[in-house]
Amino acid sequence: MELKLHRHGIRIALASVFGAMLTATPLVGDSALANGIVMGKVFWFHLSMALMAIGTIVTIGFGRKKGISFSLPDGLLLLFAGVTLATYDWQLGPEPEKLLFGGQLIVLWFLLRHFLTEAPCLKFFFLFMLMLTGLVEAVWGMQQLHGHVYSHHSLFRLTGSFFNPGPYSGYLAVVLPVCLWTAMRFQKGMHYFGWVCVGAILVVLPAGMSRSAWVAAVVACGWVYWAERIGWEKTKAIYSRYKNVAVPFFAIVILLAGCAFAGLYGLKRDSADGRLLMWKVTGKAIAGHPVTGTGLGGFPEAYAEMQGQYFGTEEATDKEKRVAGCPEYAFNEYLQIGLEQGIGGWIVFVSWLGSMMYYGIRNRQHGAVGGVLALVVFAMSSYPLQLPSFWVALMFLGAVCVTEEGTQRARIFAEKLLTGLLALTAVGLFVGQKGNYEAYRRWGRMQMLYNNKAYESVAEDYHSLHDKLKHKPEFLFEEAQCLSKTEQYTEAIQVLERAKRLSGDPMIRYMIAKNRQALGDYREAERELLQAIEILPERLYPYYLLAKLYAEPEFYQEDKFRAAAGAVLTKEPKVESTAVREMRTGIKKILEKK
């Protein structure tokens, strides 16, 4: 008996250690990698999953005879994974790394379900680790605000371990309700620790200036307080007692909420208008792919195409054209999932989130439910699910919500076999992405030469990594720039044409036009620039390139040249800059010669 308990303890200890490593994913970064802030987290996650899987395989015979009670969220998660695979564009292959990461997330979900069933004490341990990451992030942010630690963005002092304040604030908002629940639920040590975490997060959260995170934090913490201190019975009793004033009370609450949202809108009006435009255009794009979707990674191209069509109609306003951009994300995860996985995928995903929270309420895991709720609200106006940190947190919070006490099962061998297969899958996925680390490390070194304009010396290195990183539009743009600067214009265009299918970045179209102009293919260059103007009609740079194109002796068209030059000289830029002044000076010089 003692030996069995000892073996079980080893198994749970390993699960605790590797689970703690996984919850620490947001804190990891690797400056040696290209995009090391995100990719460092991804590779750390894969490594931690491989270690957890190996530990699971080694100790698979040590577990107690408790079986998982499979539930609706388990099935919905698998169904959503199936929809994602079914709608994916396998020929283009826009997001191979996300597929590997998603596979590991599914393995993590079921391994967590397995361990939490065997050892329910791990539920609070994992929540504690999430709180600890929130505390570390909050202290990190304080250090950045006081100038003791550098941020990861030149324009913002506060980023924590993230690239900008938006996702940083969102992560704190997800952890905050868990901390509040701990402070309200426990006594003595954990009670005080919970309040310390709450206080630390509240110090830095306002400084992040993320309205989405503020709303998520208020909604989730309000719900946690209601669930812990009030509940349905008290709510019904209060309603019965003060029934006559209920309607005026709710009217006042709605009015105050409306005033609060109006204030948040006015805080950064252009940003809010930009997001409203994104949501409108994404909604129109969904109508074009309601069933099949565009597939994972298909958002940027579909969005750019639809925005170009929308701006060609009378419905588009000058204000919308002024605030428009070509985002990588929809800044609303539900709309992005609706576009990429179709309406069916959207229904499955929303049902999965809802079922997790339902099980969490039923199991009285109000802290975990609060964390999921904060993420659900934050995802309505941001992009948390495009970052690994939020997915890892969601898996832990969701597994805590869903997992109930295990039962004695007759088919314990089958369950152990399934657990072993899951662990082997995690190891296989780790092996499948192993070469990616070296590729990103090499890319990081190459970027130093690229940024120093050593295009000729690094062009061959970019070519050698093409097959490994051809799904990254940033890499393709840099590769094409090297080819263009070494006068390999045809090859540069081929690379950029692929990048155009992966990204809505207008610079890709501008680069294609410049390379076609260098080859003397003026008609195609003109077509590319006109398409870019349709997508972003208020940008000055494509008009500048058009004016230079029409000024070419072999393609000179005076009326078109003067129209494009006039746009450069008269259009109001978003921000006055040195680049704008240089473009206008250049156009004036060309006009003087003409």
State what each model feature region is:
Residues 260-277, 423-453:
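Hydrophobic alpha-helical transmembrane segments in integral membrane proteins
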Residues 149-155, 296-339:
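Interfacial juxtamembrane loops and adjacent helix segments
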Residues 470-471, 503-504, 537, 573:
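Short coil turns that delineate tetratricopeptide repeat
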Residues 2, 12-28, 46-58, 81-89, ...:
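Alpha-helical transmembrane segments of multi-pass inner-membrane proteins
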Residues 467, 500-501, 531-534, 567-570:
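Conserved structural position within tetratricopeptide repeats
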Residues 451, 485, 518-519, 552-553:
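Register position in tetratricopeptide repeats
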Residues 443-444, 474-478, 507-514, 541-545, ...:
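Alpha-solenoid helical repeat scaffolds
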